[in-house]
């Protein structure tokens, strides 16, 4: 995204930053002679490496660094595993799709705004992990340019984040022709991507795809993933576990259980996706091959009042908090009806006035979003059209998540002890939500809050250079406020303000640590 091409109104931004880019034209940025790849960081064989351009470009220097894989190796081995090869995927399946963005925040974690050309973190488009994870891997010390030594292969597709052009905006024939739900074209695009990988590289066939990683940020995660990917590792936001699943989105064009046939695909597309769970921490038939539910991206300003960025820990004077879509204008199956039921109970019972039980949209619950989260004891985690990032919101604010989604793993539930810092309520027990929460002893509440303070940093992304610098600035500012307020308060509120390095053991590091544990199982 460091390269922005301006037309009459909006920028066309790339999903990644360029390290050796010579010019930008109406056809897009071009790499310097001798360089290639998605980020122009790869040098053609036999040519000497050139000095990085990053130090000469302040707008780059503040946001990223040269990929270690693009630098002359040191005399002693210092590299850390896992080593990950990032495919320079055919542009049709990734970067070409981004030209169809009609709004700057779509499908990116960062954009450059005109006329000041400032970098703005973007989490309003909730699928931003697609480009974020891609960029993190490109500049990571875990990246390798040598596929022969790779532990894993990352496939940076854009099927999940920007399905509109895949379904009907892009060049004809739209992956087996137009028609049917958008999921059909997305499925066909990923099957074509595997065909392209097989025609271009030998690595998929070498281990049957077990060491290949695919990210699914779509509302219903990998529920619709084509069966050809079953042996691969899936990173997803939606940890639905039930094997006999059906689409529950209220967004009709994304229903993955509605088949469609045409002359280009007379068998329909359901035959290519049936039979696998949406997510499985232990995949049947593929021993050791696992999936992982990972966090959605949240910009630092989203949680600016949280003790996680060293803001003062304050009294938790809000018993329960949720602000967002409560299904007032949705189909009944939205959120499995959970948000609607809790909202109705609270409104009819006058819980806001009686118990400081706050739930509703912006008209019902007003005030600073981060401030309210940082003052709440319990926070609702319920689905939307599929996954919802409310678990991340709760955890990074030190609020105890109240999870009401049956048979669904939340973020990192397969690798962290979520029970130690969260509360689970069965969907059948929604009517008892107030009774259940009121019955939790104060000692248990403080224990869960303390445990949140041990893991909350793993639910935010902080290691990208620009993110790290912004987080440190925010922490410095909040620490000064904390020093001023400390003299006026002797109470100890949990979790205590975070004092560590925001780049250490963040969400990306947690994913890499988990991948390291999976290396033996891909062989």
Regions found by a protein language model. Give the residues of each.
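Donor nucleotide-activated moiety binding/catalytic core segment of transferases
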Residues: 308-313, 333, 337-392, 396-400
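Short, solvent-exposed loop/turn segments at secondary-structure junctions
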Residues: 91-93, 158-162, 219-222, 241-242, ...
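Catalytic core of nucleotide-activated saccharide and alditol-phosphate transferases
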Residues: 180-314
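N-terminal pre-catalytic "stem/leader" segment of glycosyltransferase-like enzymes
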Residues: 2-8, 43-213, 217-218, 463-471, ...
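Conserved donor-binding/catalytic core segment of Leloir-type glycosyltransferases
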Residues: 314-328
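A Trp-anchored, charged/polar loop motif used as the substrate-binding/catalytic surface
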Residues: 126-144, 195-199, 287-311, 362-365, ...
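Catalytic binding pocket for nucleotide-activated donors in carbohydrate/polymer assembly enzymes
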Residues: 368-460, 473-477, 485-489, 498
């Amino acid at each position: 995204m460091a390269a922005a091409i301006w037309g009459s109104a909006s920028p066309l931004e790339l999903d990644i930053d360029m390290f050796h880019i010579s010019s930008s034209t109406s056809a897009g940025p071009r790499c310097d002679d001798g360089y290639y790849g998605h980020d122009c960081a790869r040098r053609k064989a036999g040519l000497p490496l050139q000095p990085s351009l990053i130090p000469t470009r302040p707008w780059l220097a503040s946001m990223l660094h040269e990929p270690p894989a693009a630098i002359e190796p040191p005399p002693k081995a210092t590299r850390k595993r896992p080593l990950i090869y990032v495919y320079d995927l055919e542009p049709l399946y990734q970067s070409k799709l981004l030209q169809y963005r009609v709004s700057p925040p779509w499908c990116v974690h960062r954009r450059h705004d005109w006329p000041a050309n400032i970098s703005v973190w973007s989490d309003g488009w909730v699928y931003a992990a697609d480009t974020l994870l891609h960029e993190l891997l490109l500049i990571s010390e875990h990246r390798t340019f040598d596929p022969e030594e790779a532990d894993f292969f990352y496939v940076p597709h854009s099927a999940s984040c920007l399905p509109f052009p895949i379904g009907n905006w892009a060049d004809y024939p739209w992956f087996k022709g137009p028609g049917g739900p958008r999921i059909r074209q997305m499925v066909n695009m990923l099957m074509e991507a595997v065909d392209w990988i097989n025609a271009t590289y030998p690595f998929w066939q070498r281990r049957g795809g077990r060491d290949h990683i695919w990210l699914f940020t779509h509302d219903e995660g990998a529920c619709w993933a084509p069966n050809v990917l079953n042996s691969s590792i899936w990173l997803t936001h939606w940890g639905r576990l039930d094997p006999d699943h059906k689409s529950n989105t209220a967004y009709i064009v994304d229903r993955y259980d509605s088949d469609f046939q045409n002359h280009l695909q007379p068998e329909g597309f359901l035959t290519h996706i049936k039979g696998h769970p949406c997510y499985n921490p232990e995949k049947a038939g593929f021993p050791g091959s696992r999936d992982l539910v990972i966090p959605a991206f949240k910009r630092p300003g989203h949680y600016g009042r949280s003790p996680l960025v060293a803001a003062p820990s304050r009294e938790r004077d809000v018993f329960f908090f949720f602000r967002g879509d409560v299904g007032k204008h949705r189909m009944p199956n939205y959120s499995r009806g959970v948000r609607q039921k809790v909202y109705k109970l609270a409104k009819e019972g006058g819980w806001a006035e009686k118990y400081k039980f706050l739930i509703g949209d912006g008209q019902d619950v007003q005030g600073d979003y981060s401030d309210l989260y940082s003052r709440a004891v319990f926070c609702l985690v319920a689905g939307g059209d599929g996954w919802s990032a409310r678990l991340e919101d709760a955890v990074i604010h030190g609020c105890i998540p109240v999870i009401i989604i049956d048979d669904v793993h939340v973020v990192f539930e397969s690798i962290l002890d979520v029970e130690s810092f969260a509360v689970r309520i069965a969907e059948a027990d929604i009517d008892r939500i107030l009774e259940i929460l009121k019955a939790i002893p104060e000692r248990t509440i403080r224990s869960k809050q303390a445990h949140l303070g041990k893991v909350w940093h793993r639910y935010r992304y902080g290691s990208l250079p620009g993110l790290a610098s912004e987080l440190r600035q925010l922490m410095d500012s909040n620490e000064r406020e904390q020093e001023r307020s400390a003299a006026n308060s002797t109470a100890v509120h949990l979790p205590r303000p975070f004092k560590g390095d925001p780049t250490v053991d963040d969400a990306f590091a947690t994913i890499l640590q988990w991948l390291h544990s999976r290396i033996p199982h891909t062989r």
